Amino acid sequence: MQAAPKIEILLEEVIKKKASDLHLQVGLPPMLRVDGALVPVASADVLNDEAVETLIFAILDEDQKQILLKDKEFDFSFAFGDLGRFRVNAFHERGNLAAALRLIPNEILTVEQLGLPEVVKKFADYPRGLVLVTGPTGSGKSTSLAALLHKINVEQGKHIITIEDPIEYTHTSSKSVVVQREVHYDTYSFSAALRSALRQDPDVVLIGEMRDLETIASAITIAETGHLVFATLHTNSAAQSIDRMIDVFPPHQQPQIRSQLSNILMAICSQRLVPMIGSGRIAAAEIMIATPAVRNIIREGKTHQMDAVIQTGAEFGMQSMDRTLVNLVHAGTISYEEARNYAVDIDELDRLMRG
């Protein structure tokens, strides 16, 4: 039998190497994602099935093991001492166990530390409405939302309810009262928790992910009733985010949803993590603010015009992804080559580079 490395040693390696993720899979050594690239843990052996099982079972309790074996996959999170938390997706592949572990640092960074535009701080001051933070997996959505919630928590006397699967960043009540509910442990589903949320006297509700019609409908209702709602979507732009929310509804409901969204939507931050010169990654974001022009576009179903409105909306704090990338190149933070890799429109990027 192969001697498995201790899971604690691998978790310490994640933190030491400033990795974002650890991957465990039969037939490979433990793999780290460092600055966006996968690299093997130095001097680690290739893992066999027993080694992977030992590593994964070391971070599961008995109930969690049974869920994983029954359902074939399982999401959970756990604290690793004072060093951070890990969000885990354990699953089966080709008949063997495997897992992806993402590091969630204990320290919650500020909007400034994340490199996000100044206007993003104002999202925490909205009295009501819907704010979306969007992007692909691993784009820093949870980190940005944690920064906004932390700002509210330490500056305002609000009742904040988060509904997450699983809980990532943990918030200790400060000026605000923070309630964090984890799907499968504290509630059966996002939709069930959202139905209860309105009876819990919230000021702010965070929805970890809007995955289906019922969750999106609940988010709209909560925002319409005078609360501030933060939520995430796996979309790459403001226009795509709006279309995604509307398209989950049957055609006969879509005009009504457009009207509701046009009234409650406050802002969308669509972000990616871009490798910096040297090491590390920085958030690059498209920012949409719901001006009267934006609300009309949503109401009339003309989201194809959204990019143009964002490009000309700098006075309101809006900026396109390409403009953000150019600013980062000019600041010496990222290379022009990386900017091209993440550009929405390379011709537009080059035009902006020329000034």
Residue ranges and their predicted role:
Residues M1-G355:
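Short, flexible helix-loop junctions that flank or precede catalytic/ligand sites
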